[in-house]
Amino acid sequence: MLDAFSRAVVSADASTSTVSDIAALRAFVASGNRRLDAVNAIASNASCMVSDAVAGMICENQGLIQAGGNCYPNRRMAACLRDAEIVLRYVTYALLAGDASVLDDRCLNGLKETYAALGVPTTSTVRAVQIMKAQAAAHIQDTPSEARAGAKLRKMGTPVVEDRCASLVAEASSYFDRVISALS
């Protein structure tokens, strides 16, 4: 797993040069409080997000909770909730690090094959991830630290207020899209 700083150093080391991507590192540092706010917003609402996503998935496919369905009996429902929570947790890790490698290496590697072997319907799982993606975007947009603290407390390049979370929403969405691609 490489964060933005490690990636820049490894890249510079491989080319035997100095770290030249200072602008990208400066942007990463400047987004630090917003990034922490975004991760906190997702982590603080994780239980509700997971249960709502699984409930939404079940509402769209009632067969999942019927006898023989993948969310029946209770132990299968618990496994479904656990898996959704794990996916969400690794998305937050990736968002915090600014890098998808932790998500790829520790969560997505072999996930589709495992679900296929267990007979888990990936279309329903993809739908639950899509619901969590929409929820995460809503929670991230609702937690602007700059709006509460004021520009005088943020000296590292505060963005325009309307656009303060757009890049983090896009980044988080890209991580959810990676999960969806891995399952499809």
Curated annotation (Swiss-Prot):
Entry binding sites for (2R,3E)-phycoerythrobilin 2: C80
Induction (record text): Transcribed during growth in green light.
Residues that coordinate or bind (2R,3E)-phycoerythrobilin 3: C165
Subcellular location: Cellular thylakoid membrane
Keywords: Antenna complex, Bile pigment, Chromophore, Electron transport, Membrane, Methylation, Photosynthesis, Phycobilisome, Thylakoid, Transport
Record PTM N4-methylasparagine, positions in chain: N70
PTM statement from Swiss-Prot or TrEMBL: Contains three covalently linked bilin chromophores.
Topology of this chain in the membrane: Peripheral membrane protein
Main location per the UniProt record: membrane
Cellular component per GO, a single term: phycobilisome
Classification via InterPro entries: Globin-like_sf, Phycobilisome_asu/bsu, Phycobilisome_asu/bsu_sf
Family: Belongs to the phycobiliprotein family.
Cited function: Light-harvesting photosynthetic bile pigment-protein from the phycobiliprotein complex.
Subunit structure: Heterodimer of an alpha and a beta chain.
Protein name (record): C-phycoerythrin beta chain
